[in-house]
Amino acid sequence: MIALLNGQLIEKTVSQVILDVGGVGYRLLIPLSTYYALPDEGDVRLRVHTHVREDALLLFGFLTETEKDLFGLLLSVSGVGPKVALNILSHLPAADLQQALSQGNAKHLATVPGIGKKTAERLVLELREKVGPVQAVPGNAPLPAETAGDLREDALSALVNLGYKENLSRKALDGIDTAPDAPLEDILKQALKLLMR
């Protein structure tokens, strides 16, 4: 089983990356959190979950061991496959997911598109004891808080890299109302909603 890949980033889209490792190109499916955190080029290291099916071998890449472990836990729940697990991690940061599971907050889990009330309740029922309380994990500690201006500039850069014009991206960012401590993912989600109208 492949557990870790360290190589040159060849291609990056919102759902997958291609890494060149020793002349071999590996395609890894990724959550949005990994997409936003990866550089556009250069060397990257991803933790890998290898998923084997009868007809395919799928690789899923994560920046942190915590995300990889949560992905594996989500797959252990009946009715949750790789696409659903990746969707959950794309919409909920790892700490939020851990907190929702450990506190039995099925309502918060049901805010993820494609996750209904029954699935959310099943996730809580099967994973609540496995996740335990949220703790700071070495290597996954949050980085120092960025200023709101830095986050806006990062969001602008991400939108331009996605192909949106800079002036339209600035208007979208100016048109959203986010909390001063809102994470980059939330800022981008709201801006993308405006840009897709």
Curated annotation (Swiss-Prot):
Residues covered by region (Flexible linker): 142-146
GO cellular component labels: cytoplasm; Holliday junction helicase complex; Holliday junction resolvase complex
UniProt record similarity statement: Belongs to the RuvA family.
Species of provenance: Syntrophotalea carbinolica (strain DSM 2380 / NBRC 103641 / GraBd1) (Pelobacter carbinolicus)
Localization terms from the record: Cytoplasm
InterPro entries: DNA_helicase_Holl-junc_RuvA_I, Hlx-hairpin-Hlx_DNA-bd_motif, NA-bd_OB-fold, RuvA, RuvA_2-like, RuvA_C, RuvA_C_sf
GO molecular function: ATP binding; four-way junction DNA binding; four-way junction helicase activity
Location of region: Domain I: 1-63
Domain III, as annotated region: 147-197
Presence of keyword DNA repair: yes
Gene for this chain: ruvA
Main location: cytoplasm
Protein name: Holliday junction branch migration complex subunit RuvA
Complex and partners: Homotetramer. Forms an RuvA(8)-RuvB(12)-Holliday junction (HJ) complex. HJ DNA is sandwiched between 2 RuvA tetramers; dsDNA enters through RuvA and exits via RuvB. An RuvB hexamer assembles on each DNA strand where it exits the tetramer. Each RuvB hexamer is contacted by two RuvA subunits (via domain III) on 2 adjacent RuvB subunits; this complex drives branch migration. In the full resolvosome a probable DNA-RuvA(4)-RuvB(12)-RuvC(2) complex forms which resolves the HJ.
Record key words, sorted: Cytoplasm, DNA damage, DNA recombination, DNA repair, DNA-binding
